[in-house]
């Protein structure tokens, strides 16, 4: 078998990175002195690393992050917000995902909830967890359209199956009875099987009322499915009188606006 034939077969098997590395070895006289086992190991390592990198990129792309540049390393701890750095670093290990636990990120608009949630999502993708980000209004609209078009089960699976689901703008608006049923169904399917990050302007204690309180038969059921297995990060201001939105902190300098 000729070397070109070997290269062609590698390409046919979609081992293109391995094929390119093999060409490099053939063109470099130094590799003739390297034992076969070592050369073969190098080829396998290169192909393996490339596939893992491509998988990670695909997971990040498919997650649909609102802020794909978000990073745990870039979280600003000097911006006047109360942040538990130890808890954030512990959650960044993604151990909560392997334990099937949830995370509540709450705080006023502009405090950095979405950025932090996307940063946790990026860490999940780096550890090859299937992740999906969605705004709650978009999720409910998606399910409503699916109900009309007859593909409700497929869309429900889209949000039930990810190992990590990030629900942004959670309880921003009070859901209708039908929307509550959709929320209950998703959370019921995910409980003890996967993890969910909830981002909300309302603190956890206010979610029950946003769900309709005693007037809603599903409010208790929904809260019960998420309350007992969740970490909480409540982002508050150190000095309320000088509180600034993170959008303002990182926005266009006032001197350049006019």
Predicted segments — roles?
Residues 101, 128-130, 161-164, 192-198:
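Loop/turn-to-beta-strand initiation segments
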Residues 11, 16-67:
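Interdomain "pre-motor" coupling segment immediately N-terminal to P-loop NTPase/helicase cores
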Residues 75, 117, 135:
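Conserved hydrophobic/aromatic pocket- or pore-lining residues that grip, position, or stack substrates
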């Amino acid at each position: 078998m000729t070397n070109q034939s070997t290269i062609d077969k590698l390409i046919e098997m979609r081992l293109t990175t391995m094929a390119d590395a093999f060409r490099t070895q053939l063109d470099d006289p130094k590799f003739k002195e390297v034992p076969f086992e070592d050369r073969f190991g190098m080829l396998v390592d290169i192909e393996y690393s490339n596939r893992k990198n491509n998988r990670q990129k695909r997971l990040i792309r498919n997650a649909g992050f609102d802020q794909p540049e978000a990073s745990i390393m870039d979280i600003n701890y000097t911006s006047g917000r109360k942040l538990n750095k130890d808890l954030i670093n512990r959650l960044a290990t993604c151990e909560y995902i392997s334990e099937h636990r949830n995370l509540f990120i709450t705080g006023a608009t502009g405090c950095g909830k979405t950025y932090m949630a996307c940063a946790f999502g990026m860490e999940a993708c780096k550890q090859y967890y299937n992740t999906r980000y969605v705004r709650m209004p978009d999720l409910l609209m998606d399910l409503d359209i699916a109900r009309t078009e007859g593909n409700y089960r497929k869309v429900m699976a889209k949000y039930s199956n990810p190992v990590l689901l990030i629900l942004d703008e959670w309880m921003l608006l009070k859901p209708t009875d039908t929307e509550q049923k959709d929320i209950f169904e998703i959370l019921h399917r995910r409980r003890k099987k996967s993890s969910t990050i909830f981002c909300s302007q309302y603190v956890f204690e206010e979610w029950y009322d946003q769900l309709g309180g005693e007037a809603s038969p599903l409010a208790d059921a929904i809260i019960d499915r998420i309350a007992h297995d969740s970490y909480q990060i409540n982002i508050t201001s150190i000095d309320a009188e000088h509180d600034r939105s993170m959008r303002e902190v990182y926005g266009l300098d006032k001197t350049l606006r006019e």
